[in-house]
């Protein structure tokens, strides 16, 4: 009888571990403050960032979810808020990024996936050490409906 309980416990544990690991990965995503009120949804597009590494390099991953029922074009510039409470903006004309996201779709930066390079930002392009990093922002984000 004890043997059956052990196997039931072991089975339940194997089901719980992957779910726990998945939850930990998702909890690392932080909202990108798009509004003065701190909201991370603008015109039906939700935005998040995550500080992590890729091939040993500190990277800011960006994720956008288009909740609209039509595609949208996003345009923005990268900005980082430092521990010294200063914004570092990349807002020269050549620094502007854009991306078209289909309706009800999520696009996110992923290590080893070069499909959306604009969603992977090198921390060293803004601060010398990741300890100086505080937050990421999609500065001057605009959401344009695509016909």
Residue ranges and their predicted role:
Residues 25-56:
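Low-complexity, acidic Ser/Thr/Pro/Gly-rich terminal tails and inter-domain linkers that flank the onset
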Residues 59, 71-75, 138-140:
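Exposed beta-strand and adjacent loop surfaces of beta-rich binding modules
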Residues 60-66:
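Short, well-ordered beta-strand segments enriched in hydrophobic/aromatic residues
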Residues 69-87:
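Short acidic, flexible loop segments centered on an aromatic residue
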Residues 83-125:
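Intrinsically disordered, low-complexity Pro/Gly/Ser/Thr-rich segments with frequent PxxP/GP/PP motifs
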Residues 110-147:
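Terminal connector regions
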């Amino acid at each position: 009888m004890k043997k059956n309980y052990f196997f039931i416990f072991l089975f339940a544990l194997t089901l719980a571990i992957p779910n726990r690991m998945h939850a930990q990965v998702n909890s690392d995503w932080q909202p990108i403050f798009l509004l003065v009120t701190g909201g991370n949804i603008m015109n039906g597009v939700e935005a998040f960032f995550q500080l992590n590494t890729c091939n040993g390099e500190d990277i800011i991953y960006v994720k956008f979810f288009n909740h609209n029922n039509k595609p949208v074009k996003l345009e923005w510039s990268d900005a980082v808020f430092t521990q010294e409470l200063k914004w570092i903006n990349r807002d020269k004309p050549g620094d502007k990024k854009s991306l078209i996201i289909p309706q009800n779709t999520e696009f996110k930066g992923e290590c080893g996936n070069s499909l959306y390079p604009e969603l992977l930002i090198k921390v060293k392009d803004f601060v010398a050490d990741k300890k100086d990093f505080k937050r990421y922002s999609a500065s001057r984000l605009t959401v344009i409906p695509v016909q």
